Swiss-Prot record:
S-adenosyl-L-methionine binds at W10, M45, E66, R120. The keyword Hydrolase does not apply. It is found in: Cytoplasm. This is Thiopurine S-methyltransferase. It comes from Photobacterium profundum (strain SS9).
Amino acid sequence: MDAEFWHSRWAENRIGFHLDDTNPVLTQYWPMVKATRDDRVLVPMCGKSVDLVWLAQKHNNVIGIELSDIAVRSFFAEHLYTPMVTSIGHESVYAFDEITIHCGDYFSVRIDPVDVVYDRAALIAMPKNMREMYVERLLSLVKKGGRILLVTLDYPQEQLNGPPFSVMSDEVRRLFDGCNITLLARDEKDETHPRRKNGLSHFAEETWLIEVA
């Protein structure tokens, strides 16, 4: 993912990927992760997602990583939270109650190991040449026995430029080779879906449970 591209998306408010409500995939499949209240939860490339609030109602330590300071400041402002802000090297850490967001480069922010991960928007934001590096970094942050709830998209990449990019099932299995991988759901969208209306021959959302061995 190009950092300047991401900054410009937020600066120009081109954030069609942002959901105003909690993602139904999260509410439906989070129980499969079997996370306890004290488990440390990581949300990479969290933006200003309201999913953070939902997770914070269930867990004592929810950690986001986000490159855009506009996104981070918007999250806290929109929820009327006043965070404590600490600068550490090239990153800023925003903390309020159960939620901590590291504003900085995903590949270099300093975070203690986590128990569970919710990835709805991070892997699919990565171009193909960055995905192995993204997953390598992610797995380095997850404790042995940790779990990842992963959401990916499957569509003909040649028919639409990303991001979000298509990450097909065989690539998921290759990237997370060595982990226990379970496909929880595949939601094939019909012709009424906006992406299909834009000319895609098919468009599906897949939900995965990745267990780190």
